[in-house]
Each structure stands twice: as structure tokens, then as C-alpha cells.
Curated annotation (Swiss-Prot):
Ranges where the record places region Disordered: 91-121
Any one annotated GO CC term: small ribosomal subunit
PANTHER family: 30S RIBOSOMAL PROTEIN S13/40S RIBOSOMAL PROTEIN S18 (PTHR10871), SMALL RIBOSOMAL SUBUNIT PROTEIN US13M (PTHR10871:SF1)
InterPro entries: Rbsml_uS13_C, Ribosomal_uS13, Ribosomal_uS13-like_H2TH, Ribosomal_uS13_bac-type, Ribosomal_uS13_CS
Source organism per UniProt: Listeria welshimeri serovar 6b (strain ATCC 35897 / DSM 20650 / CCUG 15529 / CIP 8149 / NCTC 11857 / SLCC 5334 / V8)
Bias-annotated ranges (Basic residues): 106-121
Gene: rpsM
Subunit composition and interactions: Part of the 30S ribosomal subunit. Forms a loose heterodimer with protein S19. Forms two bridges to the 50S subunit in the 70S ribosome.
Alphabetical GO biological process terms: translation
Protein name (record): Small ribosomal subunit protein uS13
Keyword terms, alphabetized: Ribonucleoprotein, Ribosomal protein, RNA-binding, rRNA-binding, tRNA-binding
One Gene Ontology MF term: rRNA binding
Entry similarity comment: Belongs to the universal ribosomal protein uS13 family.
Transmembrane stretches, start-end: none
Length: 121
């Protein structure tokens, strides 16, 4: 496995797909990085030369990925919570942040349902 940005990317896959294993790199960014490095998207990771890998690493060093990106996202969420914004409150309570309905769905965000005792007759 080739090691790029602190992540072991799979050797047998095409490089454009292998790069998506890095947090913060999707297909679009991977394509842009490869175009800038002058590497074909159809090349397998195992077939890359050290020079090509070096170019890709150099370009990825300029992009915020992995730990730096995760840290920035967490700091943004903490900031929202600290300033007491509506979005911060939703994060704190573990509810959907972007205006989704919570009457019926939102189980992913709310977690498993908690049974409430019914009224006795």
C-alpha cells in the first residue's frame, strides 16, 4: 500500500479511487489533484512512480485533509455550541441541525427510541 497524507491507499485500485480513501478528498478533488500532477486517472496505484507519488503528496500538503480537517470541523461545532446559536443547541441535544422534521424520523441522529410508559386505565 502506498502511504499518502498519512493514509494507506489501496494498491490495486485506480489512483482516482484510491485517493478518496483520504478524509476530505472526494472524486472531484481527486481528479483535480491528478490533473495538476499530470497523472492519468486510469493508472493503478501500484504503477505510480516515486516521482508521481511525490507530486501528489506535494499537492495534497496544500489541501486541508485528515486530522487538520477533522480538527477544524470539531472546532467549528464547538464554537457554535459556545456562542449559544440555534445550530449549537441542536448539536448539543443531538438533534438534526439543518431544519429536518423530527416528529417521525431522525432516528439516525436521535438514536434508538426510548419507550415511554403509557397511561394506565
Amino acid at each position: 500500500m502506498a502511504r499518502i497524507a498519512g493514509v494507506d491507499v489501496p494498491r490495486e485500485k485506480r489512483i482516482v479511487i484510491s485517493l478518496t480513501y483520504i478524509y476530505g478528498i472526494g472524486k472531484q478533488t481527486a481528479s483535480e489533484v491528478l490533473a495538476e500532477a499530470g497523472v492519468s486517472e486510469d493508472t493503478r496505484t501500484r504503477d505510480l512512480t516515486e516521482e508521481e507519488l511525490g507530486k501528489i503528496r506535494e499537492i495534497l500538503d496544500r489541501i486541508k485533509v485528515e486530522g487538520d480537517l477533522r480538527r477544524e470541523v470539531n472546532l467549528n461545532i464547538k464554537r457554535l455550541i459556545e456562542i449559544g446559536s440555534y445550530r449549537g443547541m441542536r448539536h448539543r441535544r443531538g438533534l438534526p441541525v439543518r431544519g429536518q422534521n423530527t416528529k417521525n424520523n431522525a432516528r439516525t441522529r436521535k438514536g434508538p427510541s426510548k419507550t415511554v410508559a403509557g397511561k394506565k386505565k
